Amino acid sequence: MRVLLATCGSRGDTEPLVALAVRVRDLGADVRMCAPPDCAERLAEVGVPHVPVGPSARAPIQRAKPLTAEDVRRFTTEAIATQFDEIPAAAEGCAAVVTTGLLAAAIGVRSVAEKLGIPYFYAFHCPSYVPSPYYPPPPLGEPSTQDTIDIPAQWERNNQSAYQRYGGLLNSHRDAIGLPPVEDIFTFGYTDHPWVAADPVLAPLQPTDLDAVQTGAWILPDERPLSPELAAFLDAGPPPVYLGFGSLGAPADAVRVAIDAIRAHGRRVILSRGWADLVLPDDGADCFAIGEVNHQVLFGRVAAVIHHGGAGTTHVAARAGAPQILLPQMADQPYYAGRVAELGVGVAHDGPIPTFDSLSAALATALTPETHARATAVAGTIRTDGAAVAARLLLDAVSREKPTVSA
């Protein structure tokens, strides 16, 4: 049996699929992965065949200017078209297709799977995105009247907005390969049987009328040692505070403001350069900049983790028992910020842009013995087998060819 995994997103979208790929392979199936060209080295590390699809996922971060509305429209057009152009050859002979991340790409992937008669599966990294009549949808970043309409109407409004953005492009490509038009974009891309690749303690699945399954987060154990230089820095003093924004750019002056606040608490700093290639504001001996490292090990040796609130970073920090301060920038990050605060394992910063005072106050909470104790306690409840659970679920579903889980 051969399985195709596909995504066009950033590290936060690709890394869970890397974990799933390894666990599917462990069960004896062949696996290949369609992903941006940036993923070549990572997939080579774990021995998963890589089919480069689409442009570099780093391109939006490395732009000199912010994305405009026209840029977003062009990206959407290309994301949908790329799936129709590239996925068919990669999916040929596969028994199933699994995708995560951008809806614009997912609807293209499912269309190809439909044409080839291949079962299709979609996984969320955040339960708040699972459509439900019992809680409101996450904001789409556009003017909304959601406070004046009921919850099902809010989801339908967002679904119609998705159709307005994607429907014409999608159905044009579908018509070209002999497929009927799609109107319900959410159900088509997400299916009525989605998976939730998030931890049930950190991000519990809420009531939904869909046949959703929560597997736990898809995280591959990382056995890599820390570099001698980083290990020496850690050994040279008390646990530092980690600062990083992953594959996002940092808000203006956020690095300087954060380091000033951390220093004011008498703590050292580890700055993750990330995709934006962040730099330290000075050459102080109390700061250390890092590139690619084993965060699973590193987070177990820091006093706190200040980050953007991506699902992957939040899960890894929670599993390591590290207190967190989340500066949510977009998408599912406000949700994870709220959950960290609700669990008592850290602080949800009010808004994406920190000030010295706001971060100082957040650190005053995150660095307390009480927060550390709570983070340690919650760490013991976080599942470590999510990718293995999903791999078994996938292969069992395909083998049984159950209509409730196949396209």
UniProtKB/Swiss-Prot annotation:
GO biological process, one term: lipid glycosylation
Catalytic activity: vancomycin aglycone + UDP-alpha-D-glucose = devancoaminyl-vancomycin + UDP
Stretches that traverse the bilayer: none
Record pathway: Antibiotic biosynthesis; vancomycin biosynthesis
One term of GO molecular function: UDP-glycosyltransferase activity
InterPro entries referenced in this protein's UniProt entry, alphabetically: EryCIII-like_C, Glycosyltransferase_28, GlycoTrans_28_N, UDP_glucos_trans
Pfam families to which the protein is assigned, alphabetical: EryCIII-like_C, Glyco_transf_28
Keywords: Antibiotic biosynthesis, Glycosyltransferase, Transferase
E.C. numbers: 2.4.1.310
PANTHER family tied to this protein: STEROL 3-BETA-GLUCOSYLTRANSFERASE, STEROL 3-BETA-GLUCOSYLTRANSFERASE UGT80A2
Note: In A.orientalis different glycosyltransferases are involved in biosynthesis of the vancomycin group of antibiotics. GtfA (AC P96558), GtfB and GtfC (AC P96560) are involved in biosynthesis of antibiotic chloroeremomycin, while GtfD (AC Q9AFC7) and GtfE (AC G4V4R9) are involved in biosynthesis of vancomycin.
Function as written in the Swiss-Prot or TrEMBL entry: Glucosyltransferase that transfers glucose to the 4-OH-Phegly(4) residue of vancomycin aglycone (AGV) to produce devancoaminyl-vancomycin (DVV) in the biosynthesis of glycopeptide antibiotic chloroeremomycin, a member of the vancomycin group of antibiotics.
Similarity comment: Belongs to the glycosyltransferase 28 family.
Name of the protein in its database record: Vancomycin aglycone glucosyltransferase
Gene behind this protein: gtfB
